[in-house]
């Protein structure tokens, strides 16, 4: 008795690539587009006004400096002032338990109407202002910290100007992505006959149906 093997069986036994997988190697590679995660949500103002966390943070409440908690108070005071002059500070909004790493422009500009880090505005206090994106919304921290107690009061405001800038960038990003996807479909979309159609139409080596007789 003779045993016959088809090409697929022989290829599998020899560790070769089966015919159908070998054919896939000749397909034209398609481009891969990476859509960067948006920095902001589509309607920032609406989220700022309706989100419970933002509503709580928008009301002025107690804040505390949280850096170097294990150090003596005198050293913490010195480090807080040094950090502020370098352009950053670790602040906690006590009521909500929200910890913030603030960054701001510590360079004193005599022509600016308001400083991001102002030691001169009020004796014994530093007034801070810092803009950042929180939960997809552009906000601005505004408040003060007592240089002796290392606590104070602050709130979060909606940063209208930066929100508009981020919205414009978001729309450009979406438009660019859609254009690239449309161009990709136009270039690389080639109609292909489904594999099962070979059986219905009588592919190579297969008998044709009644209509082909």
UniProtKB/Swiss-Prot annotation:
<dbReference type="GO" id="GO:0048749">
    <property type="term" value="P:compound eye development"/>
</dbReference>
<dbReference type="GO" id="GO:0035206">
    <property type="term" value="P:regulation of hemocyte proliferation"/>
</dbReference>
<comment type="similarity">
    <text>Belongs to the CBF-beta family.</text>
</comment>
<dbReference type="GO" id="GO:0003713">
    <property type="term" value="F:transcription coactivator activity"/>
</dbReference>
<protein>
    <recommendedName>
        <fullName>Protein brother</fullName>
    </recommendedName>
</protein>
<comment type="function">
    <text>Regulates the DNA-binding properties of Runt.</text>
</comment>
<dbReference type="Pfam" id="PF02312">
    <property type="entry name" value="CBF_beta"/>
</dbReference>
<dbReference type="GO" id="GO:0006357">
    <property type="term" value="P:regulation of transcription by RNA polymerase II"/>
</dbReference>
<keyword id="KW-0539">Nucleus</keyword>
<feature type="compositionally biased region" description="Gly residues">
    <location>
        <begin position="203"/>
        <end position="213"/>
    </location>
</feature>
<dbReference type="GO" id="GO:0005634">
    <property type="term" value="C:nucleus"/>
</dbReference>
<dbReference type="InterPro" id="IPR003417">
    <property type="entry name" value="CBF_beta"/>
</dbReference>
<dbReference type="GO" id="GO:0016513">
    <property type="term" value="C:core-binding factor complex"/>
</dbReference>
<dbReference type="InterPro" id="IPR036552">
    <property type="entry name" value="CBF_bsu_sf"/>
</dbReference>
<feature type="region of interest" description="Disordered">
    <location>
        <begin position="189"/>
        <end position="213"/>
    </location>
</feature>
